[in-house]
Amino acid sequence: MQPRTNYLLGVDFGSDSVRCLVVDAADGSELASAVVAYPRWAERLYCDPAHNRYRQHPLDYVESLEASVRQALAACGRDVADAVCGISFDTTASTPALTDAKGTPLALLPEFAEEPDAMFVLWKDHTALAEADEINDLARKWETDYTRYSGGTYSCEWVWAKMLHCLRRSPGLRAAAYSWVEHCDWISALLVGDTTPETIARSRCVAGHKAMWHASWGGLPAPEFLEAVDPLLGIFRGHLYSDTVTGDACVGRLCGEWAARLGLKPGIAVGVGAIDCHVGAVGAGIVPGTLVKVMGTSTCDIVVGTYDEVGDRTVRGICGQVDGSVLPGYIGFEAGQAAFGDLYAWFRRVMAWPLRQIAGSDPQLEERILGELTAEAERLPLTPDDPVALDWHNGRRTPDADPRVRGALDGLTLATSAPAIYKALVEATVFGSRAIDERMLEEGVPIDNILAIGGIARKSPFVMQTMADVIGVPIRVVASDQACALGAAMFAAVAAGLYGSVQEAQRAMCPGFSDEYLPDMERHAVYDRLYDRYLKLGGRR
């Protein structure tokens, strides 16, 4: 009799769509996947980009989850579906929503179905600037510094600021709201059939990095601190949590309703949801001393360190350090850039404007712009006098968060070409990446090697070679387009009891590497001088 083959589902909720990946638990091989776009988001409903408002309806998540799982399983057949033994997730973060006492996001109630402030507030929403300032001002005066493990600054992208902003805009929401839930916690709660705010499992990853949760002060900030920000937040504190769980935990079993909706057997293990970049780092094979760069529209940089290495030290100016947020038993560090690929897309739109407005060009012509710019930029000579840009078009996430700073270009002449400007923008994003690496090293976080995942890492040799030359170390690209979903499947494998630890699952299931970029040290010497100009342009020298 052949031994039973076990399969796992890793579900990756991105900014625009959800991806379901079917994985063989024995070796991580990918059987099938399906990607389903969020239908309302695709129509740009409930968003106001001019005011940095980005909202997603909870039905987008529910409908797309159901469709993606069913499509992926249909590509495998019934035998595979019946042999799935675990499912886990990653989502963007902080992407929270206000809920009622049952844990239902308020946008699922008829009276708030079209109210953007009742929906999930997407990670890149920057409407809560004033509320973040209030939290930071109070934290600097409070006896306990609740931002200590958040890099010293609480961001407008994080849950307390976002929920406070929504509560203050609508008296109706303020009266109806009982608690809040992060996207990743809501999905796992849905699947086990219990969304009660006081009892659902809460992810250590998102709680520690986005909600100022830390064991040293008993979990979330004290009720008195939250009440001083707004009395309702203090009340919410009693409807939330003190304990959290790491990504390897099983939060429960798939309930009958959701088993039927997804086409799975009831009772399979449901894992803990966590932040996409952290889960992607697991899928990449992160170990202590490895920096994983998750490279897409923005970036996220993930490192893990041992307790002996880190001790009581805190790293200033990053997005947090949390015990067990990536690998259980290790400190997880998060940093990142607010715009990376988005910066290249912005310049493409600038270049395409006359084509659209005057020539009425074919959209396929616009798609060629970055490819042509890249080809020409690769041929340009590299000199210390080249134009230099700042990559802060969407503010600065790290080092030292400041959403109000803006991008810049320096050193332009009448001879500066479009490819030269594009080259400067690529270099600026990579200089921003180097600044993060240097901050980690300055603060005593060991980094021995760099791995890269994400669309840019897989698709842009120009950007990756520039990064290797600027940073001056080799960079290996992980051989999977779906590292986040694969990392979620690894967590599902541990939750289902197939492996005794995340590291054991990684050893069996990690995909290896597809490319390695080695630095050109002659170019690195020139980039050192350009990097110094970048730092001076941003007032950081």
Segments from the language model and where they lie:
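Active-site phosphate-binding/coordination module
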Residues: R78-W158
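Phosphate/ATP-binding catalytic cores across multiple sugar-kinase/actin-like superfamilies
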Residues: L65-A75, E257, G285, I421-D448, ...
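Gly/Ser/Thr-rich active-site cleft segment
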Residues: F13-S15, A139-V272, L390-N394, Y422, ...
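N-terminal glycine/serine-rich phosphate-binding loop of ATP-dependent small-molecule kinases
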Residues: M1-L108, I235, A260, L264-A269, ...
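Acidic, glycine/GT-rich loop-and beta-edge segments that sit at the periphery of enzyme/chaperone cores
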Residues: E157, A335, L343-A345, V350-A359, ...
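ATP-dependent carbohydrate kinase catalytic cores
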Residues: W158, M212-P328, L355-R356, S361-A375, ...
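Glycine-rich phosphate-binding/hydrolytic loop that grips phosphoryl groups
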Residues: A130-D133, V279-G283, A338-G341, A345-R348, ...
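Activation-segment/catalytic-loop signature of the eukaryotic protein kinase fold
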Residues: R379-A479
